[in-house]
């Protein structure tokens, strides 16, 4: 029960941090379109975010398995926060450009590719098995709230104080989430080093698993199709 209580604290802090990150992402879209008036610029932002995320996600599972999950999460979050801090500095000095935002989105996509699998494994290790269903519901609830409210909050704050105000909120939410993870959360580690000599070896094993477990493969293909054609 103690671990579950600590997870609740982690969940709250991570949810607030996720809200800050989502607000920043939406505010950057507003800023870019306001400055350029180009839908193409917004499309390039998405491209810069998703391409690194997709490419790195292919290999990152092996990396996460062979390193401490807490360290991976802390480093990934710190790099993302540093990128936000740089965007804030550029914004405050009036030197921010669309090019800076493209680079920021690439960094954000990269850090997310590392943070998400490490977080998923960490949650499974610190939460009692009988509470995993609760955790799944809590995560879905918070993620949906972020999706619904982050654009509205970002638009309000963007109108009130511009991009710097949203970036400041994002950085404060990072400090809270980072502190909780660093000082309050202990993640039991089981580091796997012996199975794979390279990321490609791990990918090969993954494809072999999907070949044998066709049910899981069909579910993945179905979900991919649904996400590709959301309407």
Could you describe each region identified by the protein language model?
Residues 66-80:
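Cytoplasmic membrane-interface "Motif A"-like loop-to-helix N-cap segments
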Residues 1-7, 186-220:
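Juxtamembrane intracellular "pre-TM" segments in multi-pass secondary transporters
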Residues 94, 121, 125, 163, ...:
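Helix-loop junctions on the cytosolic side of multi-pass membrane transporters
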Residues 104-147:
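Cytoplasmic helix-loop-helix junction between adjacent transmembrane helices
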Residues 15, 96-114, 224:
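Hydrophobic core of transmembrane alpha-helices in multi-pass small-molecule transporters
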Residues 161-168, 208-231:
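A single, central transmembrane helix in multi-pass transporters
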Residues 78-95:
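C-terminal ends and interior cores of transmembrane alpha-helices
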């Amino acid at each position: 029960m103690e671990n579950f209580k600590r997870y609740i604290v982690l969940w709250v802090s991570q949810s607030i941090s996720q809200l800050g990150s989502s607000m920043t992402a939406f505010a950057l879209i507003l800023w870019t379109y306001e400055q350029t008036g180009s839908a193409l610029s917004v499309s390039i932002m998405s491209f810069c975010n998703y391409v690194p995320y997709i490419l790195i996600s292919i290999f990152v599972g092996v990396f996460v398995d062979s390193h401490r999950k807490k360290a991976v999460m802390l480093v990934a979050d710190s790099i993302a926060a540093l990128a936000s801090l740089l965007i804030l500095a550029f914004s405050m000095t009036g030197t921010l450009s669309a090019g800076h935002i493209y680079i920021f989105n690439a960094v954000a996509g990269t850090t997310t590719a590392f943070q998400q699998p490490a977080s998923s494994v960490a949650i499974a290790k610190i939460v009692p098995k009988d509470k995993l269903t609760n955790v799944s519901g809590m995560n879905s609830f918070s993620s949906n709230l972020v999706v619904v409210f982050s654009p509205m909050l970002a638009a309000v704050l963007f109108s009130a104080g511009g991009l710097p105000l949203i970036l400041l909120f994002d950085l404060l939410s990072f400090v809270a989430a980072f502190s909780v993870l660093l000082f309050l959360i202990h993640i039991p580690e089981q580091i796997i080093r012996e199975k794979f000599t390279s990321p490609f070896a791990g990918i090969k094993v993954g494809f072999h698993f999907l070949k044998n477990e066709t049910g899981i493969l069909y579910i993945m293909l179905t979900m991919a199709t649904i996400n590709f054609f959301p309407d």
